Amino acid sequence: MICIILGLIINLGGWFGNDLIHAFTGFAFSGSRSEQSAGSAVRATDDAIGTFDKVEGNIDAGNVKFVYGDDYGFAYDNYPEKEIPKAEINGKTLKITQKVKNKNRIGDFKNGYNGAEIVITLPEDMAVDVDLHLSMGAVETKGITFGDMKLDADMGSIELDTVTVKDMDLTADMGAITVEDSVFSDGDIKAAMGGIELKNVKFDDADLEADMGGIKINGSFNELKARCSMGGIDVTADDDDAKMNLSADLGGITVNGQSVGRSYKN
């Protein structure tokens, strides 16, 4: 009976989280002025917003991604007119805010905000620090070099591909975290309802925790600490002398292809 209940929880959690995550699909945008499009959704780009070396944001709904360009830039796409994101330069920090006036309209997040997106453009020679909190939306970024990074997603996934980061702090309450072909120094990564996967990564030290979801890692690292409450841990380490401290409450642990039970420390 317990196994059946746990299975239902996991299946429902996975379905619910994926449904919400996939509610946010990216839309392309162009132009340097605000436009009115179907469904009272607004798109806009700001061509010259000044230089910055840090990005801070508090975003109620929508995806966020970073891209390289010739200059600094901020753009948004497919937001309701009354809830478009706001951006300002404060010192050397780009501050972004986006507020949903009535957060009880859960259905609107899927229907009215489908494709809502914020795009931040950086020059290739600039590695900015990032501190973003998203209530409902995903972060997807590929091929960017950052300074320190802190991402906190309440409902949505975090996907980083081919990025370089100094210190990485990632949290997803309902959504998966994936870091692929990337390099970082120290990492603190937590997922409450969703898995954590680090694919072909290189790092010095990382602390990973998943409450309801598995952890899978392959790459080169010096030290790794990982804990799972409900899920397994699978680690493939390129370095023979890599230090690991692993524990799984409800799930098995595999290290370099060998099953080691529910706890492992070397």
What are these regions (language model features)?
Residues 2-3, 51, 202, 220:
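Hydrophobic alpha-helical segments and their boundary regions
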Residues 99, 161-163, 167-172, 176-266:
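Short, surface-exposed interaction patches in beta-rich subdomains
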Residues 11-100, 109-133, 138-150, 158-161, ...:
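Short linear S-[DN]-x-LW-Φ motif typified by the pepsin-like aspartic protease active-site region
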